[in-house]
């Protein structure tokens, strides 16, 4: 009898090990495929060239921190702009705004540089325990397009472990240890730092080398976050941002202007203005899939921005932006970013006498009442 019990226990142990191994293999394959997924971007006729970010820091070459920089040169000389399409890949409207520029637009005068995947490593994983979708899909003229819904931070496989306290360089400011993998806390970057700091360093060097006049960093945040539907500008860019914001408001786009805090370090709108000659502006839109009050985190929420829990929160005064049963669609969020870019270009011409002319940016109403797919290949 004792031997029979032992045999049964051994069998149960073996079965548990086999099941555990099977689950591990399946999960491992899923993680591996997602980490190595190649998102397709189809450059339009406006793209005149491209290069890898590692040209500005060879240590990035061959790593997941390297990423493509698209160049769109105009027929005539003019000012330049860098668009950081998505610093945080769980904020998809910036990514889609950048891709629509690359795929749909052309440049008449000046030069536009676009980095659709500013933190490339963060596209290779999701935030743990958030139950986020891996992908979202759009129907375009070329068929179903698949885009990655990634993480706010660099993949731990590329940069680990997080310190208890992250000390920003060169300010010496102490931040939460997890911020060491946040691209928007690492500027101006460190050439021999961790992967995130190296990516920041390369972007900063690109701005210096190309003498970028305007840098736009595109973001999203939860509807309950105070700095939302806003531009955040360095003091050097405040006049430019103010004028562009007024243009947007005349178009019916409700948006606010926030000054870059001089003592909060590592962010684009602070460090790029302090360490380069560019005029840095960060833009925020509302994204319910990014917030703490959301319900099911799925592809539908990412694209439509409709969530019953945020509707209830808004009714009770817990949202910082207007929110109703129509949600905040990907079209509305992308429209905000592209409208901001359009007016920043126009107002730069008014202030400095040289215009960056980007052709093909849809108006706010065209996107709001149409489909984002119309501006993708």
Predicted segment positions?
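Short, solvent-exposed loop/turn elements at domain surfaces
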Residues: 79, 92, 290-293
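C-terminal accessory segments enriched in acidic
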Residues: 2-56, 60-70, 104, 195-214, ...
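Conserved beta-strand termini and adjacent loop/short-helix elements that scaffold enzyme active sites
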Residues: 72, 115-117, 258
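Active-site/substrate-binding loop(s) of hydrolase catalytic cores
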Residues: 92-93, 108-246
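A short, Lys/Arg-enriched amphipathic alpha-helix followed by its capping loop at the start of a domain
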Residues: 97-110
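Short hydrophobic beta-strand that contains or immediately precedes a catalytic carboxylate
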Residues: 82-85
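Proline/glycine-enriched tight loop/beta-turn segments at coil->beta junctions
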Residues: 73-80
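Di-metal (Zn2+ and/or Mg2+/Mn2+) metal-binding site signature of metallo-dependent hydrolases
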Residues: 88-96
